[in-house]
Regions:
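Alpha-helical metal-binding/catalytic segments enriched in His/Glu/Asp
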Residues: 58-59
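Extended beta-strand/beta-hairpin segments
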Residues: 1-53, 64-144
Length: 144
């Protein structure tokens, strides 16, 4: 792992209408725009879907980092995430993220350890730890 602090840089550009290309060195360009709920066209990533995707990805990557040194035998983690935007006194903001995780573990793996590692991943995910929104986690564990 690189020493801290880590820095991540992106650029975005746009005019009065149309899609906004989002770029980061060495990565494919993403075409983004407002979601349909805010008058944008369907079929594009938006800031709202990108943030929600980051929450889901972060849970998986944090779980992976926590499970490896504990030698948990697992084969797959599927996560669906719903981010809820609501009106608050401060204005529009994400108020809740609901994560539903389905974890496939080995026949001899410890289910309680797997569940605890998922809860720990939720707690230690740097994305959700950086946000001011409630995070809920539903867990289903499947044994091989």
């Amino acid at each position: 792992m690189a020493s801290f602090p880590h820095a991540y840089s992106v650029t975005a550009a746009g005019g009065p209408d149309g899609v906004l290309p989002v770029k980061s060195q060495g990565l494919p360009t993403l075409e983004t725009t407002a979601p349909p709920e805010f008058g944008g066209p369907a079929g594009y990533w938006s800031p709202e879907t990108l943030l929600t995707a980051a929450v889901a990805n972060c849970l998986i990557l944090t779980f992976r980092a926590l499970a490896a040194p504990r030698k948990l035998a697992w084969s797959n983690l599927d996560v669906s995430c719903t981010g809820e935007v609501n009106k608050t006194r401060e204005g529009l903001k994400f108020t809740k993220f609901r994560l539903d995780a389905v974890l496939s573990i080995g026949a001899d793996a410890d289910e309680s350890q797997a569940r605890a590692l998922l809860e720990s991943a939720k707690k230690h995910c740097l994305v959700t730890a950086s946000l001011n929104a409630e995070t809920e986690l539903g867990v289903e564990i499947k044994k091989a």
